[in-house]
Structure formats: structure tokens, C-alpha cells
Amino acid sequence: ASSAASAVYKRQPVEQQRLEKEQIEDMGSIYRTRGAHAIHCLTVIGQVEGHVEAPQGQKTTKYEHVIPQLVAVQEDPAIEGLLVLLNTVGGDVEAGLALAELIASISKPSAAVVLGGGHSIGIPLAVSAQRSFIVPTATMTVHPVRHSGMILGVPQTMRWFEQMQERITGFVAAHSGISEKRYTELMMRTGELVMDVGTVLDGRKAVREKLIDELGGLSDALAWLYREIEGK
């Protein structure tokens, strides 16, 4: 099968091969796979970068790169489904939540797989797909919204944090099996993280808490996507 796929790739025009190689290097994505069904593969790695550029040397997923890809997934009739692979430490809250809302609004079958980590704002991204998977060794850190840099120590600032957290908690509860109450309990737990509040969930615990739908990896996600596409 691999030799056949290689032969198909070699027959492609050189320009198309070059463009696909550049897309993988620049965007971390594949326009669409060449399996039985055309699946767009999107990777969310490192830090989700939003309105402010991350420090040099950090791996990032730029939301201005991801948004056009998600629009293409919805609009292009040749693309039949979306596969999101996550290994992220989190990042810009509003940018991450915006991407999660976009993924959730795609009408085509979508699946997400949490690999190394799906921390912080990576959690809404993981549950935004129609079906979520997590490998046993992956971890997800549930903790409150944080802010780096100087802030005004006034009640209005604290209320802003509360409102942002309510948006995230509501989204996660709406797109997974966990309740807002239970998610808040995990988020505010003390004694597990050093000098912080929150909970670290491995793959099995994330499924047990109904945060993620299913324990599984790439083949499981692709099998689910194929079933959904063929069932339409």
C-alpha cells in the first residue's frame, strides 16, 4: 500500500508536490489525504498564538493560519472531513476559543486526537470536534484562566476573568459529557499542582470524567470519520 501511495505521489506535478511540502512546513497541515476519503489534517502544536507574537524559539500555532484552512474545509466540496491532531500547552485564550468555535460550526464530520498534551485552552479545541479521542499517555491540565504581565488590581478585572472562564467552561460542557459543576471542581482543585490550582488528567481519566469521548489514536479517529462520511 505504501509503495502504491508513493507511486501516486511521484506522478503528481512537481509544482503541486512543492506546494504541499511548503504547506506542511509553514502551516503544519495537509490539504487533504489520499486515502479512501479526502480528510483535511490540521495540527495544533506548541502554543496557540493570538494577537501577540510568542517569544522567539517557541513552537506556535498561528490562528491567522488556521482560520483560512477551516473555511476551506467547510467550503471545498472535495474535502469530506476534518482531523485535528493536538499536542499543545495552551496559549491565547480568545484565539483558542475562536478556533474551537469555528471547528464546532463545521458541518462535515470532524474528529480530534489529543496526543502528548491538550492543556489549558487546548481543552476547548479538543472537544470542539464532533468526536474526540485521546491516547493513554496524553495529559490534559484543567486550570483557571491565567494572565501574564501587568493587570489592574480592581474588582472589574477579577470579574473579567470570571466572565472569560464562564465562556470556556460553558463551551467545554456543551461539547463534551462533563458538567459545568464537575469541570469547575477539577479546575479549582488544590493539592495536585505545585503553587497552583487545577487537575492533570491522563487519557483514561479524561475519558472517565467524560471530558473526552473515547480512548484511541489515529486509526480510531480515521475509522470513525470514514464511518460518518460513508453513512451520509
Predicted regions and their residues:
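Short, small-residue-biased leader/transition segments that mark boundaries at the very start
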Residues: 2-9
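STAS-typified acidic loop motif
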Residues: 13-64
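Structural motif
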Residues: 41-43, 81-85, 113
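A short, well-ordered alpha-helical element
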Residues: 54-80
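Charged, glycine-interspersed solvent-exposed loop segments at helix/strand-loop junctions
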Residues: 81, 143-229
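Glycine-rich beta-to-alpha active-site loop
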Residues: 85-99, 104-149
